[in-house]
């Protein structure tokens, strides 16, 4: 996971929100460890001043998947970078396409958050 440039590791939800809100760009995104579910990650996306959080996890067979909007077919990927590439396209079951990566090395000093909305959808490995 450390090879994924948007992976920020064990940062808090609040810190992730600050990093995204500091960009001010809809479609900004990052990946962080889930604070509530061990072994699960959160794909956090900025859209219209709110942060949407989608849970990402790895199955026992090594495939990666993200829980998306109800009714959207669940897709599995060999690598996290493939999952991210798929969600850069429109109509993939998340609020907006992933457009602006917030890389760990380029994280700036964040501003205070103005709002938050968690989809907080959880996907656990079977």
UniProtKB/Swiss-Prot annotation:
Residues 67-92 are annotated as: Interaction with FYN SH3 domain. CDD domains: SH2_SAP1a. It is found in: Cytoplasm. Residues 6-102 form the SH2 domain. Cytoplasmic adapter regulating receptors of the signaling lymphocytic activation molecule (SLAM) family such as SLAMF1, CD244, LY9, CD84, SLAMF6 and SLAMF7. In SLAM signaling seems to cooperate with SH2D1B/EAT-2. Initially it has been proposed that association with SLAMF1 prevents SLAMF1 binding to inhibitory effectors including INPP5D/SHIP1 and PTPN11/SHP-2. However, by simultaneous interactions, recruits FYN which subsequently phosphorylates and activates SLAMF1. Positively regulates CD244/2B4- and CD84-mediated natural killer (NK) cell functions. Interacts with CD84, CD244, LY9, SLAMF1 and FYN. Interacts with NTRK1, NTRK2 and NTRK3. This is SH2 domain-containing protein 1A. It comes from Rattus norvegicus. The gene is Sh2d1a.
